[in-house]
From Swiss-Prot:
This is Probable fructose-bisphosphate aldolase class 1. It comes from Aeropyrum pernix (strain ATCC 700893 / DSM 11879 / JCM 9820 / NBRC 100138 / K1). The gene is fba. Its EC number is 4.1.2.13. GO terms for molecular function: fructose-bisphosphate aldolase activity. Belongs to the DeoC/FbaB aldolase family. Homooligomer. The keyword Cytoplasm applies. It is found in: Cytoplasm. The active site is at K184 (schiff-base intermediate with dihydroxyacetone-p). GO terms for cellular component: cytoplasm. Activated by citrate.
Amino acid sequence: MISSQDVGKRVRLSRILPDGRSVIFAFDHGIEHGPGEIPEERLDPRLLIREVVEAGVDAIMTTPGIARLTWDIWANRVAMIIKVSGKTSIRPQDDQFLQSAISSVDEVVALGGDGVAATVYWGSQFEDKMLERWTRIRLRAEKLGLPALQLAYPRGPHIKNRYAVDIVAYGARAAMETGADLIKTYYTGSTESFRRVVSAAGGVPVLMSGGARTPSPQEFLHKVYSVMEAGGGGVVVGRNIFQAGDIRAMVKAIRAIVHEGFDPEKASKLLG
């Protein structure tokens, strides 16, 4: 018989990955990059969260403050993953490869969250500190039946190209071996190379980090398609959704690729 914790984790994972795949809206950009990246008309988190929920995302990954402010909008409609680590871009340059605690697994449970997320900068001079914190987070989440999503980002003074397939695959493998239930990481530029990242993760779902807004929505849809063709578990997207001209159309197009197997050309027709 499986444990109560295993049941809880499976139930929550089924909300995050309804068919084994997921379109997750990432919205931790205010603390990470400042409000300047968010269009002024979308600065109110209640307005933006309502729009992405109605657009049809499967889950939201955000900070505890935004989860608390918008609970009545997302509750019972989408899965909620709360990020418990963070940093600002205005902290000293020497500390840019370190994330600090901004919440706890217990607060995630208190807020009604379905999952917990935290970053590890693999290769950073602070890797030891971040890995120690990740382990505490994961073990507490395991005890309470919450899936743990690791933002597995290779970054550090000795990493020349953080998007190189060998580096990204290393980070994905390290995330799997340190107990991640879901892995968010960089796109490596091609289906073939990202397939190596997926393989390195040993069966743990690998979701592409959306990154900066692409020059065109069509270009981003090609990335999404490439990830899914490589066996990825979906995408975690922020700027390519909240900076889009039409949020609902963009989410609809991404969903069509992730859940319905549309190719980029067919999905692009949904953009209007």
